[in-house]
Amino acid sequence: MAAKVADDVANLKLDDSNTKPASGAAENGDKPTGDAEHEDSDDDNEAEEGAPEAGEGAAKKKKKRKPRKKKKAGAAGAGGAKTQTAPPRVRIDEVFPNDSYPEGEIQEYVNENAYRTTNEEKRHLDRMNNDFLTEYRKGAEIHREVRQWAQKWIKPGMGLTEIAEGIEDSVRALTGHQGLGNGDAQIAGMGFPTGLSINHCAAHYTPNAGNKMVVNYEDVMKVDFGVHINGRIVDSAFTLTFDPVYDNLVNACKAATNAGIKEAGIDVRMSDIGAAIQEVMESYEVEIKGEMLPVKCIRNLNGHSIGHYTIHGGKTVPIVKGGDQTKMEEGETFAIETFGSTGKGYVRDDMETSHYAMKADAPKVALRVSSAKTLLNSITKNFGTLPFCRRYLDRMGHDKYLLGLNNLVSAGIVEAYPPLCDIKGSYTAQSEHTFVLRPTCKEVLSRGDDY
């Protein structure tokens, strides 16, 4: 049969006068590329279907193909999902249209809690927790996308206000809630203001209006921000440096935080977690300007439990040994954050206050300053017990509010959180993750490829 086919092919003759090249490239003897062949497939099929008319090919012209349009950033992909932009501006529920967000890092319980991994009753309880876990995972995915962009975007010489607003605008864009209407910021958005604490300042620093500070190449900057979805707060922080001389300081905090998370679990005592953290942290040292310095835990800073709309839920997780014998419990959410320092390892209040939060158990007292009443009404509607900063009040159009704000603080209704600093000339670093104690495992919600 093969011989017959060969003979038939040999007898075939092409009428060159009636045959026209498909394209200019073919006329010139050039071979089409693989992509061109792929794109031409539809046209080839059309040509085959219209075979009777092909004999009149000399009289007819082939249709010109329209060039394919390139997809824009943020355009819909497979299944209607969009891709994220830089800076992040596509709502996260458009990137994950089915509301199915990635799980955090799963860590199994060990020792006396190992049975929880396979226990059927615990697995049933775990399946019942999907609703609130979806909200946590959504917030965690927003945190990951924003911080991964921020780590590439932040450069020496940038102003702190520009950095803070860049992060916060991205979080608000991804949640789809700008926080300008009454109550909008309580649906989703910032879990607390973006902390940008530099060098000896360890925590609670964000720029107020008019701040001219910039981050320099030789600085060590802690970037700490939270994302919340319906009051489920994901709290995570990293330390940003440009000079590799500080790598050991940064790595000490990362390793200590991971040790704390590994030790944590249902019925584990806080003191045991603190001991595990301190052992790892203080095994590091860092050489700065020719001097070898030990890395110390900042002993009066702690991790904490996280409540609904409450960043500090009542339990503290120490980062040094001894002390608190309180146990962790099933279903609780914690932020383990560790701070390392080349200074004294002890912080105090310093610099201008920027962070505030209304107390959950705020007393009902008569306010003598009229601006305090107006401000309290706005804080209650827009933030509730979520922390806020002065820039947020400026953004909402409040003017000349400082007297009223100080009145709310002195009345015990609002708590002020001043920056926390070690001795000048020292360097501090931070690492933090949020995790939930599920019935069958620990889920490190904020874990990402970056840290």
From Swiss-Prot:
Residues 60-73 have a biased composition (Basic residues). Its EC number is 3.4.11.18. The keyword Acetylation does not apply. Coiled coil: none annotated. It comes from the Eukaryota. Its main location: cytoplasm. One of its GO terms (cellular component) is cytoplasm. Keywords: Aminopeptidase, Cytoplasm, Hydrolase, Metal-binding, Protease. Residues 1-101 are annotated as: Disordered. SUPFAM superfamilies: Creatinase/aminopeptidase, Winged helix' DNA-binding domain. A divalent metal cation 1 binds at residues 224, 235, 432. InterPro entries: Creatinase/aminopeptidase-like (IPR036005), Met_Aminopeptidase_Type2 (IPR050247), Pept_M24 (IPR000994), Pept_M24_MAP (IPR001714), Pept_M24A_MAP2 (IPR002468), Pept_M24A_MAP2_BS (IPR018349), WH-like_DNA-bd_sf (IPR036388), WH_DNA-bd_sf (IPR036390). A divalent metal cation 2 binds at residues 235, 304, 337, 432. Binds 2 divalent metal cations per subunit. Has a high-affinity and a low affinity metal-binding site. The true nature of the physiological cofactor is under debate. The enzyme is active with cobalt, zinc, manganese or divalent iron ions. Most likely, methionine aminopeptidases function as mononuclear Fe(2+)-metalloproteases under physiological conditions, and the catalytically relevant metal-binding site has been assigned to the histidine-containing high-affinity site. It is found in: Cytoplasm. Substrate binds at residues 204, 312. Its cofactor is Co(2+); Zn(2+); Mn(2+); Fe(2+). GO terms for molecular function: initiator methionyl aminopeptidase activity; metal ion binding; metalloaminopeptidase activity. Cotranslationally removes the N-terminal methionine from nascent proteins. The N-terminal methionine is often cleaved when the second residue in the primary sequence is small and uncharged (Met-Ala-, Cys, Gly, Pro, Ser, Thr, or Val). Belongs to the peptidase M24A family. Methionine aminopeptidase eukaryotic type 2 subfamily. This is Methionine aminopeptidase 2-2. It comes from Pyrenophora tritici-repentis (strain Pt-1C-BFP).
